[in-house]
Amino acid sequence: MKKYFVADFNVIDVPTGGGEWVDDFIIKKFNLEFLHTRNINSFDQTAFYVFSNISLLPQHLLNQIHSLNYVILEHDYKICLSRHPWRYQDNIIPQQERINYSLYKNAKAVFVQTTDHMNVYLKNDVEANFVNLECSIWSDEDLNMLENINNENTNKNGKYAVYFTNNWIKNTQGNLKYCAENKLQNYILKENRNRVEFLSNLAKCEGIVFFPLARETFCRLVVEAKCLGLNVITSKNYGALKFF
């Protein structure tokens, strides 16, 4: 049986994406063939599929998924067009705006990252075989890298990292404003295709300021910052409340 992993992007396309690193681990661990959504014209009814972020998949293809043999590795929410249930009161999507419910109901399993992540689905009456991972996923190689970088950066620079990105959800300008108002010297943490360099630059800092505008399902950056010995200034929106 052929085994495919389907997503809009992979870690080569988006080397700074936390979700893409999770996907990359799963692809390698289970020896899956990666398929970009943009390259899919039809599905193999005899194959097994893992679907990740598939917002770029045309609706007529989405409608065919329910008949396949598949699981979903979820990083956000596919039950409304914006993928942001937090925009609605109590995260409850109006009935007329709910989409893709059969996608979840017919999956062999739907892997979610936290209890909070799962509860948003349950509040919106989504039927599925949910499997709560209660965490993100790191490879042994990644964990060893974090440990080595932490050991090499015991002397902090006294600055607070602000992740500099065009992704509005990460709230770069708001984080810079917080630093200014609270007299914290900021360190601009630029996106970097080299993961070791990115985390090494983060590890030099005293802390990180991160107030995402959207409710994240699990912010790996915040957890990795904590692993690297940084003070973390954030809000409940970072999604990994069980950890600290």
For the regions a language model picked out, list residue spans one by one.
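Short alpha-helical segment that forms part of, or immediately flanks, the ligand-binding pocket
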Residues: 199, 222-228
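Conserved catalytic-core segment of nucleotide-activated headgroup transferases in glycan assembly
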Residues: 138-198
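A short, active-site helix/loop in glycosyltransferases that binds the activated sugar's phosphate group
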Residues: 105-130
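Membrane-proximal helix-turn-helix segments that form the acceptor-binding/catalytic region
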Residues: 89-110, 203
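Active-site proximal beta-strand in glycosyltransferases
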Residues: 48-50, 65-94
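Acidic donor-binding loop of glycosyltransferase active sites
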Residues: 203-217, 230-231
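Alpha-helix capping/helix-boundary segments
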Residues: 55-56, 78, 116-118, 239
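N-terminal pre-catalytic "stem/leader" segment of glycosyltransferase-like enzymes
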Residues: 1-60, 66, 219, 233-240, ...
